Design a protein with these regions (language model features):
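Short, well-structured N-terminal submotif of metal-dependent ribonuclease cores
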Residues: 1-40, 49-66
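Short, hinge-like loop/turn segments at secondary-structure boundaries
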Residues: 54-58, 92, 146-149
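Acidic, PIN/NYN-like endoribonuclease modules and their adjacent C-terminal/linker elements
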Residues: 118, 122-154
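Conserved beta-strand scaffold positions in the cores of enzyme catalytic domains, especially
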Residues: 37, 72-74, 145-147
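A generic structural signal for short hydrophobic patches within well-formed alpha-helices
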Residues: 11, 44-47, 135-136
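Active-site neighborhoods of divalent-metal-dependent phosphate/nucleic-acid chemistry enzymes
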Residues: 73-127
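Generic structural signal for small/hydrophobic residues in well-ordered secondary structure
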Residues: 7-8, 47, 85, 121
Length: 154
């Protein structure tokens, strides 16, 4: 049994029918029991925003709604997720009281939306499946991060 948090890029790949999305299904099978995959409510908001800004047609919006209903949505209003957000935010600035960024590194910057997604995975003890390398500094610190190269799966 594996638990996954699918980042926005992975869900977008499912929506588009991208080859890397097929790779995720074939390799990790996140949507089939006994595995559990969720998406953060933050990813849903990012996808809705993307559709709004890019003036997606009704057909694509309907497809997004259908996909969003298939993948459980994890709210961020949970004490463990709120705590992990604080910890990850401090860690990225090398201000965490008990965790240090590896020697030779000065810090890194995650956007707040990515921190929420990572905090969700960390609180759930889930693997982050992502197309975003920005999550990599968190690998094996707050969660296991599996980077999927969106251009590497043709």
């Amino acid at each position: 049994v594996s638990r996954y948090v699918l980042d926005t890029g992975i869900v977008l790949g499912f929506l588009r029918g991208a080859p890397y999305a097929r790779h995720v299904i074939d390799t990790y099978d996140p949507l089939s029991p006994p595995n559990l995959a969720v998406q953060s409510v933050v990813s849903v908001a990012e996808l809705e925003s993307l559709g709004f800004k890019n003036k997606w047609g009704q057909q694509k919006l309907d497809k997004l709604d259908e996909l969003v209903r298939k993948i459980p949505i994890q709210d961020i209003n949970h004490p463990a997720i709120l705590r992990k957000f604080s910890e990850i935010d401090a860690y990225q600035e090398n201000k965490h009281p008990s965790l240090s960024i590896p020697s030779g590194k000065s810090g890194f910057k995650l956007g707040d939306n990515d921190i929420w997604i990572a905090a969700t995975a960390s609180a759930m003890q889930a693997v982050i499946l992502t197309t975003d390398k920005d999550f990599l500094p968190l690998n094996n610190v707050f969660a296991t991060v599996i980077y999927i190269d969106p251009n590497g799966c043709k």
